[in-house]
């Protein structure tokens, strides 16, 4: 399997929402990108809003690579850009050629959009911050903006402890035990990305059957294989991973404070339940919801459960929240969907 990745970055459409009173070249701003499908539209939007709300003195250019864009979403993003006098660029991509790559219900084809952003922008920019769309900013990016690269491929945050030994064993390299990173936050040295032809290397590795059989998190595992011994390590505050299902698992309303604190810059809401779901009624989700409530999305209801795995998790949250009738109804619906 040999993919023509240059063809993949021939976007079907590029839409620029530039509401700045004074225009700047992209290289004079801090560039941040997301890669999304329809399910993560609101996540990327609130991620942008959270950065702007917490970094009002900085100049940004925001880039969203998406396989679906509708008029309402574009209009709401335009309102967001107007509110903060910023620029948001939208890139519509055809996802069909990427569907030959490893994916699953949990890991959709959109996970590969970050690779396309690295490849596309490597010819245009020196650096790029990539964020997953389930990440919210709650602090200053000044230290990150001031970071300088030498020959590192980028700057990353080590994944949680539970991922380390398992990843080293899976990837057959003990060096990953203590250095395996989470790809949700990646500050990429695009000069080095271009020089080392890393997009091509990524797809070469993804075409290797001996590599494919080791993969559990397709793009993240490949990026780790490439970045081993070639990355700056950022402190945990830039990728504070929190899973909202911990609320009913731990049954402790303060549990999230072990992960999210005053130093936290980025909160990464991993797992099935996201803070934009209508059952995520917890203090841990307020960092997202507080921004949501001052955004153009504020009058739009939170997302309902649609997929089977969402219903499975939703009913457990509802029962924990003592919403017994709704919880039982959702559990029944899940069992019907399960068959």
UniProtKB/Swiss-Prot annotation:
Pfam families in alphabetical order: Glyco_transf_8 (PF01501), Glyco_transf_8C (PF08437)
Chief place of localization: membrane
InterPro entries xrefs: Glyco_trans_8, Glyco_transf_8N, Glycosyltrans_8_dom-fam, Nucleotide-diphossugar_trans
Places the protein is found: Cell inner membrane
Pathway membership, UniProt: Bacterial outer membrane biogenesis; LPS core biosynthesis
Required co-factors: Mg(2+)
CC per GO annotation: plasma membrane
Listed GO MF terms: lipopolysaccharide 3-alpha-galactosyltransferase activity; metal ion binding
Protein residues bound to Mg(2+): 132, 134, 268
GO biological process per UniProt: lipopolysaccharide core region biosynthetic process
Signal among keywords: no
Cross-referenced PANTHER family: GLYCOSYLTRANSFERASE 8 DOMAIN-CONTAINING PROTEIN (PTHR13778), LIPOPOLYSACCHARIDE 1,2-GLUCOSYLTRANSFERASE (PTHR13778:SF64)
Further details from the record: Strain F653 represents the enterobacterial R3 oligosaccharide core type.
Free-text comment about domains: The C-terminal domain is important for catalytic activity and membrane association.
Family in the record: Belongs to the glycosyltransferase 8 family.
Function: Glucosyltransferase involved in the biosynthesis of the core oligosaccharide region of lipopolysaccharide (LPS). Catalyzes the addition of a glucose (glucose II) to the outer-core galactose I. Has a marked preference for its specific donor substrate, but it appears to have a relaxed specificity for alternate LPS acceptor residues, providing the overall size of the acceptor is conserved.
Protein name (database record): Lipopolysaccharide 1,2-glucosyltransferase
Native source organism of the sequence: Escherichia coli
Species lineage: Bacteria, Pseudomonadati, Pseudomonadota, Gammaproteobacteria, Enterobacterales
């Amino acid at each position: 399997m040999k993919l023509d990745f240059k063809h993949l970055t021939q976007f079907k459409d590029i839409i620029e929402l530039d509401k700045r009173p004074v225009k700047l070249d992209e290289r004079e701003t801090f560039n941040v990108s997301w890669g999304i499908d329809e399910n993560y539209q609101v996540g990327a939007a609130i991620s942008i809003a959270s950065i702007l709300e917490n970094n009002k003195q900085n100049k940004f250019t925001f880039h969203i690579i998406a396989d679906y864009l509708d008029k309402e979403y574009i209009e709401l993003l335009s309102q967001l850009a107007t509110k903060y006098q910023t620029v948001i660029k939208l890139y519509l991509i055809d996802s069909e050629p990427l569907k030959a790559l490893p994916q699953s219900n949990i890991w959709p084809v959109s996970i590969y959009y970050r690779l396309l952003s690295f490849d596309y922008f490597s010819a245009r920019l020196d650096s790029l911050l990539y964020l997953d769309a389930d990440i919210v900013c709650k602090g200053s990016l000044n230290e990150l903006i001031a970071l300088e690269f030498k020959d590192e491929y980028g700057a990353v945050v080590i994944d949680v402890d539970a991922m380390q030994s398992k990843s080293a064993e899976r990837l057959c390299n003990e060096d990953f035990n203590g250095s395996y990173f989470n790809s949700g936050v990646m500050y990429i040295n695009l000069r080095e990305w271009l020089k080392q032809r890393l997009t091509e290397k990524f797809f070469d590795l993804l075409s290797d059957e001996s590599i494919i059989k080791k993969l559990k998190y397709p793009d993240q595992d490949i990026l780790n294989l490439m970045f081993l011994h070639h990355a700056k390590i950022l402190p945990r505050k830039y990728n504070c991973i929190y899973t909202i299902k911990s609320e009913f698992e731990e049954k402790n309303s303060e549990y999230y404070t072990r992960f999210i604190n005053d130093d936290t810059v980025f909160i990464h809401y991993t797992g099935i339940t996201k803070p934009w779901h209508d059952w995520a009624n917890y203090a841990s989700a307020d960092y997202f919801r507080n921004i949501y409530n001052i955004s153009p999305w504020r009058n739009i209801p939170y997302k309902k459960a649609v997929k089977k795995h969402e219903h499975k998790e939703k009913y457990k949250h509802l029962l924990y929240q003592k919403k017994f009738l709704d919880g039982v109804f959702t559990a029944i619906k899940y069992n019907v969907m399960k068959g």
